[in-house]
Amino acid sequence: MRNLNRIIFINSANIPYADDIYLDGNIHFIGTQGVGKSTILRAILFFYNADTQKLGIPVEKQSYTEYYFPYSNSYIVYEVATENGPFCILSFKSMNRVCYRFIDSPYRKEFFIDEESRTAYSGTDRIRAILDQYDVDYSRIIYTYDEYRNILYGNEAGADMQRYALMESKQYQNIPRTIQNVLLNSKLDAEFIKKTIISSLNEEDTSVDLNTYKAVSYTHLRA
């Protein structure tokens, strides 16, 4: 079973550091206005849809990239649980847009933060050097949202990237749209969810793990 297990903020969205936001079950965010509920939900939504224009951010507010990645050492790390152990997706700003690197390891604080100075490493080259030091495999930098989504949803990703797929589906587009509608409180009916599942399963040349699909399309939508 594969699912988003945890989200880690490092110098992101006015959060100096937070690594205890677990998403491995039914989650209920509570709190008064301005405490960060929407901040967390938008970061979760961006994991699934990778679309800065469809996060429900008002036009008068800072963009997703500006707000979540104000510094050269601002990061959001997504930890994904799989049947073979967790992996991480590092998101960061480069050339004024969000980029990604897939890391074949569960989240470890020492990969991103200097233990002596207790500050986050500035720039991904330093993080890459630390990963090499710990002999951890990682992907090249993913510069486009389309490629990120194709990897995440197993849509013709290369053999070296298949380990990082939540599922395998060429017709995955309705999945992030469904999650987007739920998190943004948009209209969503049972018929649309049914069509989403059918369209993703109705593929002759694609292997789909039903348990994986249920975990993403049902468990997270209940959260």
Q: Positions of the model-derived regions?
A:
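Extreme N-terminal "head/tail" segments of very large remodeling/mechanoenzyme assemblies
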Residues: 1-112
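Glycine-rich phosphate-binding loops of NTPases
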Residues: 86-183
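Structural motif
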Residues: 183-191
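Short, charge-rich amphipathic alpha-helices with coiled-coil/heptad character
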Residues: 200-210
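Acidic, proline/serine/threonine- and glycine-rich low-complexity intrinsically disordered segments
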Residues: 215-216
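Conserved small/polar residues in nucleotide/adenosyl-binding loops
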Residues: 219-223
